[in-house]
Amino acid sequence: GLFRMKISRRSVLRYSGLAAAWLALTGCTPTGNASLGSSLPAWMQKVLRVSPADSSAASSAASSEASSEMAASSLPASEQLDPGFSVMPNYDANPLTGEERSGNDRIVGVMVNNICNSERQNARPQRGIASADLLIESKVEGGITRFCAVYSSVDNIPEIGPIRSGRDQFLQLLMPWNALYYHDGESIFCTQFINVYNYSGLNIGGKSYFNTPVHPHVAHRIKRSENVAYEHTEFTSAKEIKQAANDAGISLSSPYEGTFFRFADYRTKAVNTLEGTPAAKSISITHSASYKTSFAYNSWNKNYKMSMYSNRTKKFESTVDELTGKQLAFDNVVVCFANIAAYAGDSHDVQEVQY
């Protein structure tokens, strides 16, 4: 029902005094608080139905009264603020890691080759993937898998590669973040996604883009051995990606709100736990008969160490970043289940992932 109360002038004075004191505690003035509209007197006139003169006088008198009353009496020790009390800053997390953000850089996703079928058809060990904030692996075609190394800032990208052509299952995960998608070539289905969703302005690496007179400095070649095929020898870096973005008129700054996953709050040092679930000490993922990925939990370092099956050596091998010489390790591993099959009518076995 309707709540009614009688407010006397004395009540108005005390109410005004409390309001003024509260505003003072929050660093606001009675006449300049935006959340009250224009001013405290006007707000009181509307809510308490007092005249401007009454409300102004009430505010002035009450402020004086509140000050004297506050000075005359102190809170009990149990009710006083902790000397270490501080206001929690606004939540501003890195969208990929959940850690405190240090800038407003655009997310960059780089396609990385992962073929390992023979001495000639071999992209391992890759470079730069250990520095990625997020490493996505998905089956593409012919049973092979490919990586998309995702970085929260172009400045975090070392030399990376071998780079390879784009696929729509990776693009679909990057598009909601207006990320720069960097690759060499793309499937016809990836091109269709780019055209339908008008994403060409954030896509670098369409067919015939790399190593052309128009864009000569967006990647480089490294001859890894006499046996490795030419298509597995292309690399790039932060400097080259910046050059390509500049050539294309793409800004590498972009403000973000929200995060890729629902992270624990970095401000409180909280930890997300899945109560009542078994501990995942090992994880095994089979993409195809020749492409399998496994993770083993290291309780000492509290991370998951990554290994992949090699169709070249016919055994599992540690996944190593060639730049560091160390096995890849992750704090979190997320396994996504989705229907995946070749696009209908496609003769190249390009895979459609139904997210």
Q: Where are the regions that the model predicts?
A:
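N-terminal secretory signal peptides
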Residues: 1-11, 15-26
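Polar/charged alpha-helical tracts
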Residues: 4, 11, 38-46, 53, ...
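Short, flexible coil/linker elements and helix-boundary hinge sites characteristic
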Residues: 27, 40-41, 45-52, 249, ...
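Bacterial lipoprotein signal-peptidase II cleavage site
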Residues: 29-36
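Post-signal peptide N-terminal segment of mature Sec-exported envelope proteins
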Residues: 37-77
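A surface/extracellular/periplasmic glyco- and lipid-processing/surface-interacting theme
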Residues: 75-134, 141-355
